[in-house]
Amino acid sequence: MKTYQIVIKPLTGFGTPLKGDTLFGNICWQIYYDKDLLGKDLETLLSDYSTNPFCIVSSAYPYMDNKNNKEEPQIYLKKPSLPLHFLFSLPEEELVQKRKELKAKEYFVYKPPLPPLSQIEYLSSDDIIIVKDEQVRCTIHRLSGTTSRGGFAPFVVPKLWYITKLVLFFGVREDIPIEGIIEALKRIGKFGYGRDATAGWGKFEVLSYEEIDFYANIRQTENAYYALSPVVPNKSGNYAEIFYEPFIRFGRHGDVLSASPNPFKSPVLMADEGAILIPKKFEKRIYVGRAILGVSSIIEKAVHQGYSLVIPVEVSYDKIQNNH
């Protein structure tokens, strides 16, 4: 499997966060309607998805190219899901005093080779500028021509604005053309992604893509994996420890199936992006996780992305063992 870095530019607000598992579903719909995109139809691509995934999609992360300063572009990843005393080398008393301040630090700059996670500088979300907004809507009573009480009362819809450019990471099987994935992504960006795409939300532009290797520039002391999207760890992964924030995906079918008698999928409990997986024996892995089956009551073969691309990181595992 090859890995790619894709830079996109948000053009509107978003009703649905750009998470890897949801974006994977959008790409599947593009392949369903145009089998020439990847040279194979969707059913063929999903036939061995449990053992040989054709595509793995990461969540989106802030990307700043700093063209005016001629500096290298900076990618901001989510703070790892580890207890504070594993992320900050501070005395316990100071950790308690600064707990709120430290918890507000939500990102770090991804610049390989990464130092140990306890030596990274973490930044607050204010430094990244991702704005959450609300839009007031109302339903018009067709008899009175006005809003009213109950189901016709004004209501608030949350909206997310990505102020910076964004970067996505894709894992693509070697027999799959990356050009087809890029074209699918362009179509999604043109017509809109997620909730309220028909109202003009969720539009973006694909700016560039390039092949990358997460293991090309490392310190050789890495001992853990950082998940780039929500993941369901494989039971046979031989992990010594897994640290994560739980994320429940209340999924629903898209496209024409959104109007089916039962558009809702079964809930899936996942480890959110930023999860840290510590294997008993560290080895080079491009991705972790597994396919999620049985999520739909109307389509037996429906799958959900439980895979995640990973970045090698170094965790003070001796410190973790001493605290357990």
Regions found by a protein language model. Give the residues of each.
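Conserved active-site/ligand-binding neighborhood in enzyme cores
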Residues: M1-H324
